[in-house]
Every structure is written in C-alpha cells, then in structure tokens.
Amino acid sequence: MAAKEGSRIFVGGLSPEVTDRDLERAFSRFGDILDCQIMLERDTGRSRGFGFITFADRRAMDESIREMHGRDFGDRVISVNRAEPKLGRDDGESHGSRGGRDSGYSIAGKGSFGGGGGGGGRVGEDECFKCGRVGHWARDCPSAGGGRGGPVGGFSSRASAYGGSDGRVDRYADRDRYVDRERYIDDRYDGAARYGARDRFDSREAYIPRDRYASDRYAAPADRFAGGDRYSRGSDRYPPGSYDKARSFERDIAPSAGSDRYGGGRAGGPIRGGGEEGRGFRSRAGAPYERPSRSGGGGAYPSSSTFDRY
C-alpha cells in the first residue's frame, strides 16, 4: 500500500467537461493506472476541477509529471504534481470519497490539501486546489468560469496566466489595491494641508497689499493721490494744489487778438500787473457774467430800471 500511495499524482485545472475516462486515457501512455478519480461537489455533483491518478510504479508517475505539467489538456492548462496522503489518517480516510469534504491528500512539498465542499479549500499556503497554481484562492481561480476563450480563461501559457513566472501576484492584488487607495487618500489630505485655506490667503497676500482697500477708500484727502496708491505712477503725478495753479495760470494768459470773444487784448505772453488789458476777462469791470447791482452801476447787463419795467 505504501508503494501505491507513493505513486499518486494530483491533476489540477481540469475543465468541467473532462471525465474520469478522458483523464485516464490521457495518462495511460505513461504506465499502468490503478485508480483515476475526478473530485466532485457533494451537493451538485459537478466537477471540482481536479483529480488524482494512481500509477502502478513510481517511474510512470515521474514521467507523467515531467511531460504533462503546464501542458494543454482540452481547453485548459493543467498542473500535475505528486500527491501524498495526509499524516494521521488511515487508509480509508486518506482515500476519502469523490464527493467527500476532504480528499485526504496533499501535494508534495506544498503543505496540506483540503478541498472544501464548495471549493473553498487550498493547496499549501498559497496554491489553488482547483488548478494547483500559486498566487490565488480557489474562489478566484480563472478556471472556474468554464472553457471560454482557450485554456485557463483565455491564457495560452502557465506563466502568462498569472502575471509572471512565479504567479504570486494575484493573491495580493486586493491588498495592494487598498494600500494604493490609502496612499492616495493620505496624499490628498497632505496636499490639502500644503495648499489649504491658510496658504491660499498667504499666496494672495504675496501679490495684493493688505492695505489696498484701506488706502483707496479711507485715506486723507491730501494723501489720496500720494505715493503708495497702485494707480499712481509717482508722488508728483497729482501734486497738491495743482488744479488751483492751472486756473491761476489760465487767468494770467492774455487772450489772443483774433480769438477773444469779448474784445480787447493783444497777442503775446502773460502780462502781469497794471491796466485793463493785463487782467483776465473775469476780473474786468463790466464782465459779461457780472451781476448787475441795484445801485445803477455800470456793467454789461441793463440797470435796475430795466428790470423795473416788468
């Protein structure tokens, strides 16, 4: 019996359409087969995607592993490994039943094998009990979706089916996904701390003075157009009293000969002091805008007697 148990192999990754006879026919060329079983689900009777073959001698077992591991069988890529009975079990428990809860075997060097009734067991620490590959659980096995699109869900080789030569990336895919999400969340809040409300106002203060509105709205009248206002070009753009100087300069200029509406005057520069001609038209006696006095004095308007007629 020990020789029989030492010649048993595990075949994983089988298509649901593969039967015991198909499996025995494929492996019979390596030697005499004593037993061939595909494990079934207890409730539904469906294939669980793996089985066991017992050869008559060890040489046939080694040759079958060397030739069939990672090869195409039907529309799947299968895995073939040596199976060993679990320790502490007698012969009856070790073999188990096709629809039993535990097959009673482990893959050599991979740890214990315990196929749950619903396919929730595992092979070793990180190996799928359905296909025998490492890197994913049985519930995530690519072979669970049936034979669509080629071997192992459409993958053509054992290495490419699991993202690399060792095939250990699928098991940690979910954990890495949450790690990346946590890293993103941390970076997002770190960014908020770096560019939050405080820095937003600080950056604005770098370009806009704090007293911008105070200087424009509440400055003293004499200092409103002095330096410091952002609309001024210099401190002398609007000097105090410039409007009065302009008006005084206008009064001092003598009217030109041809353009004076009110007569008098001669062309030339400003004439300061003395005489009616040197004075502005607003300061002359009898200016056109001078209000007539009721005393009957001279002026451009009629005397008060004229208004008395009405």
Curated annotation (Swiss-Prot):
Residues 7-85 form the RRM domain. A zinc finger (CCHC-type) spans 128-143. It is found in: Nucleus. Residues 83-101, 226-236, 244-253 have a biased composition (Basic and acidic residues). One of its GO terms (biological process) is response to water deprivation. One of its GO terms (molecular function) is RNA binding. Coiled coil: none annotated. Its main location: nucleus. Disulfide bonds: none annotated. Keywords: DNA-binding, Metal-binding, Nucleus, Phosphoprotein, RNA-binding, Stress response, Zinc, Zinc-finger. Expressed in roots, rosette and cauline leaves, stems, floral buds and flowers. InterPro entries: Nucleotide-bd_a/b_plait_sf, RBD_domain_sf, RRM_dom, Znf_CCHC, Znf_CCHC_sf. Residues 111-120, 261-273 have a biased composition (Gly residues). Residues 82-120, 224-310 are annotated as: Disordered. Binds RNA and DNA sequences non-specifically. May be involved in tolerance to cold stress. This is Glycine-rich RNA-binding protein RZ1C. It comes from Arabidopsis thaliana (Mouse-ear cress). The gene is RZ1C.
